[in-house]
A protein has these predicted regions:
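Residue-level preference for alpha-helix termini and adjacent loops
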Residues: 62, 98, 135-140, 156-165, ...
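Flexible helical/loop "lid" subdomain adjacent to adenine-nucleotide binding pockets
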Residues: 128, 133-290
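AMP-forming adenylation/ATP pyrophosphatase catalytic core
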Residues: 17-23, 29-30, 90, 164-169, ...
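Acidic, metal-coordinating catalytic cores used for nucleic-acid/nucleotide bond scission
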Residues: 63-68, 202-205, 303
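ATP-dependent adenylation/nucleotidyltransferase module used to activate substrates
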Residues: 2-150, 182, 328, 395
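Bulky hydrophobic/aromatic packing residues
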Residues: 40-44, 87-93, 123-124, 170-172, ...
Length: 441
């Protein structure tokens, strides 16, 4: 396999990547990619007199007997090179299914915890061009399968962004997305630095491993070009969706969201994307659903109703209205001092001295709020209010969306598709949507 040279440091990193004077967290597993990143970044920061900001963080998932020894090896290597190092362990029972996804979430949660403790504003990871190509191919294959079923959306084909925001607070930087894995290993060999190969990277039961084995240089170059195009399309679509929001086409009344349909013909694709994004927010879903042929037909026809991703979408001549489907709405007990996310829509903290129960309101409780006046007569919408979050404490029930938040409790709406990770190219859309969903009670 041929490799490309590693670009000059000023191409990989820029001063804007590391503004401020806080710590810079680098995720280092002990593999070749992350170790090469660590030493490349150390070189760059040394050239700017900022090497002391660098902190390597190793997450020990505890999934292999060798993991603790490997983490200790990274710590020793960092000590020899004057790099501050921390090891964090994934504690608790490991799931029997969906292990890779849960491990990934746990890894980023621990990295964010380290960043919080260190006062860092940025987390840097060593994803490479090979990783990017593999991600693109996997998503392309899934999207093609979905297209066959009339559900493809293509949104994920932009693959991994160089810059994103993680957990609403930390900048996630991937500076090596243009660099081949082989080039990084050559760099380490030239510096006489060894690395550890994870045996999971050769497990044929892994989708990524199977894709990796099929990729040659030409396929990787082709995937790289396709990602650039897909990213441009996604960024452009996000800007158009943000413009639609900023034109006052979206408003929230209680628990029902309204989108104006008139005059969107020239931006139909962006409007469809906005509807799907809002459906994910209303339904409390992390993934934005594809605009299927059935949904698109409904939006074009201007008359009908469909449920998508836990959200009811009602289309009329002049508007699209969305509210949460009355289904799978859990009751949650929140002890004093605890916090939780309810239904993927609300982040709630109980700072009071009494337990709080989170649930949907009973029919009689809703009527009491309106003094027995039907909600529709007040301009509000009964079906959507039946899915709102009611807070019950010491026998008293409060509906924050209508009555305000009781003392000792904090509550905020969540824009779930943007809550854990948002690409830099979609931050304009997030900025446009946040005022719409800001909690005004």
């Amino acid at each position: 396999m041929s490799v490309i040279d590693i670009p000059e440091l000023h191409v990989l990193f820029t001063p804007d990547d590391f503004t401020g004077d806080g710590a810079i967290v680098v995720a280092v597993s002990g593999g070749g990619d992350s170790l090469a990143l660590l030493f490349l970044l150390q070189q760059y920061l040394q050239s700017r007199g900022e090497a002391a900001r660098l902190v390597a963080v190793t997450v020990d998932h505890g999934l292999r007997a060798e993991s603790a020894v490997e983490a200790a090896g990274v710590a020793a290597l960092c000590a020899r090179h004057g790099i501050v190092h921390r090891t964090l362990c994934w504690q608790g029972e490991k799931p029997q299914s969906g292990l890779a996804r849960r491990a990934r979430t746990a890894r980023y949660d621990l990295l964010c915890q380290a960043a919080e403790d260190l006062g860092a504003g940025v987390i840097v990871t060593g994803h490479t061009l090979d990783d990017q190509a593999e991600t693109y191919i996997m998503r392309l294959q899934r999207d093609q399968a979905a297209m066959h079923d009339g559900e493809g959306g293509g949104r994920g084909l932009a693959a991994m962004p160089r810059l994103a925001v993680l957990q609403r607070k930390f900048r996630l930087l991937r500076p090596l997305l243009s660099v081949r894995r082989g080039a990084l290993r050559q760099y380490l060999q030239a510096r006489n630095i060894g690395w550890v190969d994870d045996p999971g990277n050769d497990n044929p039961s892994s989708e990524r491993v199977r894709v990796r084995r099929q990729l040659d240089d030409a396929a990787i170059s082709k995937a790289q070009a396709a990602v650039v195009c897909a990213r441009g399309r996604r960024a452009g679509r996000a800007r158009m969706m943000a413009a639609l929001v900023e034109q006052n086409r979206v408003r929230l009344c209680g628990e029902r969201l309204w989108l104006a349909r008139n005059g969107v013909e020239e931006a139909a694709a962006a409007f469809y994307g906005l509807v799907m994004t809002c459906a994910a927010i209303i339904g409390g879903r992390e993934q934005v659903p594809a605009c299927t042929a059935r949904v698109q037909h409904l939006l074009e026809a201007g008359d009908g109703r469909i449920t998508v991703a836990g959200a009811v979408i009602e289309v009329t001549r002049n508007s699209v209205r969305l509210w949460r489907e009355k289904r799978n709405l859990a009751e949650v007990a929140l002890a004093p001092g605890d916090k939780t996310v309810w239904d993927g829509r609300y982040r709630i903290a109980n700072n009071s001295g009494a337990p709080v129960t989170l649930r949907t309101p009973e029919h009689d409780e809703l009527r009491a709020v309106f003094n027995n006046t039907p909600a529709d007569d007040t301009g509000l919408h009964w079906p959507s209010l039946e899915t709102t979050c009611a807070l019950e404490r010491k026998g008293r029930v409060v509906l924050p969306v209508l009555q305000g938040v009781p003392a000792g409790v904090t509550i905020e709406r969540i824009l779930r598709p943007f809550d854990w990770l948002v690409a830099d190219s979609e931050r304009s859309l997030l900025a446009a949507l946040q005022p719409v969903f800001a909690f005004k009670a």
